[in-house]
Amino acid sequence: MAETTRLLVDADACPVKDEIYRVGARYGLKTVIVANSWMNIPQSPLIERVVVPEGPDVADDWIAEQATPADIVITNDVPLAVRCLAKQTSVLRPNGEEIDERSVGMVSAMRDLMQGLRETGAVTTYNPSFGKADRSRFLSALDTLIVRLRRKAALARTVPSSSQTIHRPVPGDVP
């Protein structure tokens, strides 16, 4: 049986939660909000709140353990993205950038570079401001990713597995 796509949200600092709720409802997707503190979420059978204990990477650990190849993880956390990609889970940043096998190396290198620059005091800001263009880019990327995963799941349902392959004898075949 094919797994159903869920939206797993690293929610503590996620600026696009409202957008995620709307897109999840439009597609009928289960949305799991994971945080280390209680958050107000819309009342919906499709939205689940998971409050994990406080501590470094506890929410990340929960998401990484629960993620499947059918899911979409929404996070800005690069180490979490790397862990999810290892499980073939799709990863989307709140700015609409998809992190995949092709981009993860550059994203990781940029994270390490910026962290080093912050530690030396060469850079003092963490993130640029988040605006309408970022929200729009995120919505477009999330729609595209959901459609791609649905097509992939539909294709997987129509392609017979090797156990379903029918062998028709050809004249001259030896049983």
Swiss-Prot record:
Transmembrane segments: none
InterPro entries with a match to the protein in the record: UPF0178
Pfam families per UniProt: DUF188 (PF02639)
Coiled-coil boundaries: none
PANTHER family assigned to the protein according to its UniProt record, in alphabetical order: UPF0178 PROTEIN YAII (PTHR35146:SF1)
HAMAP family, per database record: UPF0178
Family: Belongs to the UPF0178 family.
NCBIfam families named in the record: PRK00124.1 (NF001095)
Protein name (record): UPF0178 protein GOX1710
